[in-house]
């Protein structure tokens, strides 16, 4: 179910939307710990569970695997996808994997610049990633913002 529908339904029913966020382990061997945590979180009937994208792209491929586990537990997943360390080919691969696993909600983010790693140039901002994903038409997108003005913006007007 698309997140916008979850929020609409909750509003109509006067309910609060409960969600959790998990992150992929730094090592693949730790994934069982995440699965155990998901089993416990699912018992609390959250509307969705957000799955972050590996910091600096590390173990990022586990995002889809963990999001699929969330879905198998009967909870809607929200998969994070960052762009600063990805090119079009890697983003397309992630999107194909999300789609094959039935994941339809993506939180599109720029991601952190990793010291000593040159950012990819295909998507400089989350808005570039959103436009690319939206053109596919397969996913519902969520985004983040900096209400206090993004650190790289000259001022509020430029940021908006």
Where are these regions (language model features)?
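Alpha-helix-loop-beta-strand connector modules within alpha/beta enzyme cores
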Residues: 57-82, 123-143
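N-terminal amphipathic alpha-helix/helix-capping segment at the start of soluble metabolic enzymes
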Residues: 1-20, 27
């Amino acid at each position: 179910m698309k997140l916008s529908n979850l929020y609409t339904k909750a509003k109509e029913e006067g309910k609060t939307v409960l969600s959790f966020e998990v992150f992929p382990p730094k090592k693949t061997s730790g994934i069982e710990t995440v699965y155990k945590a998901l089993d416990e979180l699912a018992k609390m009937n959250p509307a969705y569970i957000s799955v972050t994208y590996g910091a600096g792209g590390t173990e990022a491929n586990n995002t889809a695997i963990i999001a699929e586990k969330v879905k198998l537990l009967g909870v809607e997943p929200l998969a994070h996808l960052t762009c600063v360390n990805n090119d079009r080919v890697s983003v397309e691969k992630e999107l194909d994997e999300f789609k094959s696993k039935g994941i339809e909600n993506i939180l599109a983010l720029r991601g952190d610049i990793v010291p000593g790693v040159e950012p990819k140039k295909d998507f400089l901002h989350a808005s570039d990633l959103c436009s690319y994903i939206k053109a596919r038409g397969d996913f519902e997108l969520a985004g983040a913002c900096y209400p206090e003005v993004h650190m790289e913006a000259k001022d509020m007007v430029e940021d908006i």
